[in-house]
Design a protein with these regions (language model features):
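Alpha-helical coupling/stalk and coiled-coil linker elements that connect catalytic or binding modules
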Residues: 1-266, 270-287
């Protein structure tokens, strides 16, 4: 779908005052990074029918597991992980039982405190993503070419992260185990964790789209291959109205003209925008 900035502005997909934007109405993300990913998805509506229908299928499947979505990954969790990956940590010896490591807690107290604080959040990220993969297991088997899910699965299967996948968050780790995991996450698995962060932000955006579809009771549209333009909607409403009145509309070769009349503020512009927003959301793969 090709859309210019003026049309996007006329539909209030985005707005300088967030409360007036369609994006804000549909934003159910839990993280700052997820919000940015969702915004990028909204800026790039799809044009290919197959891609749209695949996203519809994915969001439909996701809607069925929203209540099981892990809560352990919060916005704060991801901020801690991001800070950890960039933190100027003093070196940790490769030999876990070296003297410098045994004395690390006393020689580098600030860094050791950062390690102790960050590790639970790293575990939450890794194990939370592993839970998400479990929730989407059936979708992955039915659609093996879903690239983002395959990337997440590949990252979590890497040997460096396996210890975090199986770690017990409630058990306090020893000094040497903490240093071992700190070294792994800062060196061997650093790029993997960056990739996992970005993948989770995308998952958060998808979660938001599925949650919005469910919460606002949106209906996935059906696309048909026709030689002429065609549009039909039953009980179409404007997504931002609290108590909307639905309209049945049909535009095709037999019904080529929609004539609107009425007093000022009767809702003519709102109805026109409703049609535009419905078409826009349809090309995002939403209802």
């Amino acid at each position: 779908m090709l859309v210019d900035p003026i049309t996007r502005s006329d539909l209030s997909i985005f707005h300088a005052e967030e409360k007036f934007s369609v994006f804000n109405r549909l934003n159910f993300t839990r993280t700052d990074g997820g919000r940015e990913e969702l915004r990028q998805l909204f800026e790039r509506p799809l044009s290919d029918r197959l891609q749209i229908e695949q996203r519809q299928q994915f969001l439909s499947h996701l809607s069925g597991v929203l209540d099981q979505w892990p809560n352990r990954i919060s916005n704060g969790t991801l901020h801690v992980v991001e800070k950890w990956l960039e933190y100027p940590l003093d070196p940790i010896a490769e030999n876990t039982a070296s003297l410098s490591n045994l004395l690390y807690r006393w020689l580098h107290p600030a860094d050791y405190s950062m390690i102790r604080y960050s590790l639970p959040h790293l575990i939450d990220l890794v194990q939370g993503c592993n839970q998400i993969l479990g929730l989407l297991q059936s979708f992955r088997s039915e659609h093996p070419l879903q690239p983002e899910l395959l990337r997440m699965e590949r990252v979590l299967k890497k040997s460096e992260l396996k210890q975090l996948v199986s770690a017990d968050r409630s058990t306090r780790t020893s000094l040497l185990t903490s240093l071992q995991w700190a070294r792994i996450t800062r060196y061997a698995a650093k790029e993997s964790l960056h990739e996992l962060l970005n993948l989770y932000y995308l998952m958060d955006a998808w979660y938001s789209m599925a949650r919005a579809t469910q919460e606002l009771k949106l209906t996935f549209p059906i696309f048909r291959e026709t030689e002429t333009p065609y549009f039909q909607a039953n009980q179409l409403t404007h997504i931002q109205l609290e108590e909307p009145v639905g309209y049945d509309l049909q535009l095709n070769q037999q019904h080529r003209l929609l004539f609107l009349t009425g007093a000022n503020m009767a809702g003519k512009s709102t109805l026109i925008k409703s049609i535009g927003i419905a078409v826009y959301l349809a090309h995002l793969g939403m209802g």
